[in-house]
A protein has these predicted regions:
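Short, solvent-exposed loop/turn segments at secondary-structure junctions
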Residues: 48, 100-101, 201-204
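Conserved nucleotidyltransferase catalytic core and NTase-mimicking acidic/glycine-rich helix/loop elements
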Residues: 132-275
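Helical scaffold of the NTase/Pol beta-like nucleotidyltransferase catalytic core
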Residues: 1-42, 72-73, 275
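Catalytic metal-binding acidic patch
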Residues: 41-79, 90-97
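Glycine- and acidic
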Residues: 7-13, 63, 242-247
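Charged catalytic carboxylate motif
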Residues: 22-25, 76, 198, 259
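Conserved NTP/Mg2+-binding pocket subregion across the NTase superfamily
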Residues: 2-12, 79-187, 196
Length: 275
């Protein structure tokens, strides 16, 4: 992971042959937009862990800047993301200034965000010459930064551990654990394969302290006989590998409810002090 591109982009050499050059070019474009105010660009998520599935996974990035983005930079980033993020390679990126990164707070404040879920609002804002209102904080950033430290990559700029402070375990767990069985079940119904695999990943972390990908979590749960419903977990893994992670049809409601109940109880016990 040490090869560098013309602007010092690194961490690309073991990525899929078509994605590495594409990502290098995109990071270079980010650097040109931010200029001297750039602290770094960081990759986390499935592309960093080697479990990226085309048509299902996002390219997950964090952008670190010295100061908040200017109005011109926001416009340039919006236009860049509307052009470069595609259904084949969807980008999710959050930009955080130094004041938003340190001291650490949860939920974490951020400066700017783009994902495909924001595409329509961003496109509408471009047409109107306005900027869409975004939340001031994002609780998911505790999970993103934790995964960056554990399994992510510095693509450009400061090392990740210099750009981002460590995230307390309690904040990470608060960002990823459903508050109750009903909330967990709602996630499973909305995205069954994603929800089942994510529960396996959280179970692996809670029991072993290791942060893995969704695929790694499922394989651990099956190998250690920790999956409440092994057949359900295997189906979720197959759906994930096939790029069918968001398919909602044909899942047994009773099995999803049992999965939500058993994982919620176990994770609640494991995340408690001394668990």
């Amino acid at each position: 992971m040490g090869e560098r591109g013309p602007l010092g982009v690194q961490g690309l050499d073991d990525l899929p042959a078509d994605i590495g050059p594409w990502l290098e070019g995109f990071v270079q474009q980010l650097a040109l937009v931010i200029g001297d105010g750039l602290d770094g660009v960081y990759l986390h998520g499935s592309l960093a862990t080697g479990d990226f599935v085309r048509g299902s996974s996002d390219v997950d990035l964090l952008l670190a800047t010295r100061e908040p983005l200017t109005a011109a930079q926001r416009v340039a980033l919006r236009d860049l993301l509307l052009e470069r993020s595609t259904p084949r390679l969807p980008i999710e990126i959050s930009s955080l200034s130094r004041a938003e990164r340190r001291p650490w707070r949860h939920p974490c404040p951020f400066d700017w965000h783009f994902s495909e879920a924001w595409r329509d609002r961003m496109a509408a804002s471009r047409a109107l010459g306005t900027e869409p209102a975004q939340p001031a904080t994002d609780p998911d950033l505790a999970a993103h930064v934790t995964m960056l430290h554990a399994r992510g990559r510095t693509l450009l700029g400061l090392p990740a551990d210099e750009a981002f402070p460590p995230v307390p375990r309690t904040d990470f767990l608060a960002s990823v654990l459903a508050p109750d069985v009903a909330a967990c079940l709602a996630t499973l119904r909305d995205a069954p394969a994603y929800g089942v695999l994510n529960l396996c990943r959280l179970g692996m972390y809670a029991r072993t302290g290791r942060l893995g990908s969704k695929r790694e979590g499922a394989l651990w749960a099956l190998a250690e006989a920790r999956a409440p419903l092994p057949a359900l977990t295997r189906r979720a893994l197959s759906a994930y590998d096939a790029g069918d992670e968001d398919e909602r049809r044909g899942w047994d409601a009773a099995e999803l409810a049992a999965c939500a109940r058993q994982w919620t109880d176990e994770l609640k016990d494991l995340s408690a002090p001394g668990g």
